[in-house]
Amino acid sequence: MTKITYSQAINKALTEEMNRNKKLVCFGLGVNDSLNFFGTTKGLEKKFGSERVFETPTSENAMTGIGVGMSLSNNPCVMMHQRLDFFLLAMDQLVNSAAKWHYMFGGKKSVPITIRLVVGKGWGQGPTHSQSLQSWFAHIPGLKVVMPTFPSDAYNLLKKSIRDPNPVIFIEHRWLHNIEQEIKKIKYTNKKNSTELISKGKDFTAVSYSLSTIEMLSIKNVLQQNKISFDLIDLKSIKPLNISVIKNSLKKTKKLLVLDSISHPFCSVGSEVLSQLYREKNIKLIKPPILKTLPDVPTPTSTFYTKDFYIKKNDILNDISKLVGKKIKFKYSDTLLHDVPDSNFKGPF
């Protein structure tokens, strides 16, 4: 069976949407360099020309202003940043213009811009090159925030984002760009609720998104060997956030683990999930829920500190053991460098 990577799925979605809408423009730093923005923009300039697919100067605020202006002029845009951190220079354009335009003009004007931001960890990039601020963007009225996990999600959510009349923050964890999926699963669906139950079990409910979902799947075999099964729910959309699938699962398991391994604890996506569930009347847990996040400190650079900063499989399994009240037998080495991806990763950094 032919497979497609996450990067290829994004490329496929961009190609199809640029064919569908002749006004759609893609631009950003690295769009036309030899690495083609992690392979996601490969061949686009050749197909659609340099007026629709182009590099920009290193001026994030100017890039965003141009994108907002073009979008207001009925030219939808996909703007790309190889680091979320760099986009912080453009917050005024995003928060005070793009996010508010539809509201301020009574729904008569919109800003159809999709902003692709890459997050992740790796190779000691430290405090200013590895931030994941999805909760920050989700706090802003007028913005949607999505974080797809699998190629089919990236394909679907990017197409939906591009077709949305208002701004969408599309966040990709770069460790996901080489994940593969059967190409037959790459189909466009217009479902409103992106939250999905991707694995079924009975002992507890796990909620995750983006790389956190892959981390939960990586310990599934160990749990099965210990006769523990779980419902795994992948959020995909951070805002809007739909908790109906989680509620249905908790009626069965009554135990909850929220793995938010790319957020800090305060006002995290995980804490928002718990907050919304707490306000529901009919949810009764038999044990306090567990929320796993990064510590409330900036990302360290030294591997001496990263080994205690990033969440490890052992950490997750120990918490699951407490949650289900059962000792779990497992063997994972903690001697690896915790901010270096495995051999499947093929990205530039």
Question: How should these model regions be labeled?
Answer:
Residues 1-167, 171, 334-349, ...:
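Thiamine diphosphate
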